[in-house]
Design a protein with these regions (language model features):
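Mobile "lid/hinge" segments at catalytic clefts and subdomain interfaces of large enzymes
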Residues: 145-189
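Conserved SET/PR-domain catalytic core that frames the SAM/AdoMet-binding pocket
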Residues: 2-7, 79
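Terminal amphipathic helices with adjacent charged low-complexity linkers/tails
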Residues: 7-28
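Long, charge-dense accessory insertions within large macromolecular proteins
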Residues: 20-24, 30-92, 97-100
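A short, polar/charged loop-to-alpha-helix boundary motif
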Residues: 90-103, 157-166
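A short, hydrophobic, proline-anchored segment that marks a local hinge/packing element in signaling
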Residues: 132-141, 151
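Regulatory sensory and allosteric helical modules in signal-transduction proteins
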Residues: 81-85, 97, 101-120
Length: 189
């Protein structure tokens, strides 16, 4: 019988094992969480996303962004996983990680100052009027890969579909819905 266990045989000849001492806990390095620091950093990262949203709202020309607040801003880790988001329009966030992952996968040579835009529903977009802008962030000038990403997704009134508003009810192909941006390099610094 293993240490910490006791074995006994019942009247019906069943073998019963009982733990008599608690199991030794092994913890991996860095897995202990300080709840206070977790909350501090959670609020810090959420505040960054909220400030991104304020900048977007204050500089936007679109009524959908400026007044309807139909946008979302978030931070993502180096693999495209969501770190924090502001409480703007939650529906945008469900697939935004996939947009980030598309940019990461298709741009191994991205550089500081690059900004990408996409709205492709096949690569993490929701629908064509929701345009996502992705910016890789480098913490050091000599970093080869981004440390994390920031992204914003905003709804635009018209993206050039066959009907005003870019959401034709009788479209049979995505081409009828408007312009599709898929991993387009918008800015190279």
């Amino acid at each position: 019988v293993e240490p910490g266990w006791r074995a006994r045989v019942t009247a019906l000849d069943h073998l019963v094992l009982e733990r008599v001492s608690p199991r030794e806990q092994r913890r991996a390095i860095g897995t202990t969480v300080d709840p206070v620091m977790l909350e501090v950093f959670n609020n810090l990262f959420m505040n960054i996303a909220e400030q991104m949203g304020l900048r977007l709202q204050n500089t936007a020309y679109s009524v959908n962004i400026k007044e309807r607040l139909d946008f979302s801003c978030a931070l993502f880790d180096e693999q495209g996983q969501l770190i924090a988001n502001a409480p703007h329009m939650p529906v945008h966030l469900g697939s935004m990680s996939e947009s980030i992952k598309t940019v990461i996968a298709r741009n191994p040579g991205m550089k500081p100052g690059d900004i990408y835009v996409l709205n492709d529903p096949y690569n993490g977009g929701t629908h064509l009027p929701d345009v996502t802008v992705v910016t890789p962030v480098y913490l050091e000038a000599n970093d080869v890969k981004p440390s994390f990403y920031v992204a914003s997704r905003g709804h635009h009134a018209d993206i050039g579909g066959s009907t005003p508003g870019s959401m034709p009810p009788f479209s049979k192909t995505i081409d009828e819905e408007g312009v599709l941006f898929d991993n387009f390099l918008l800015v190279r610094d």
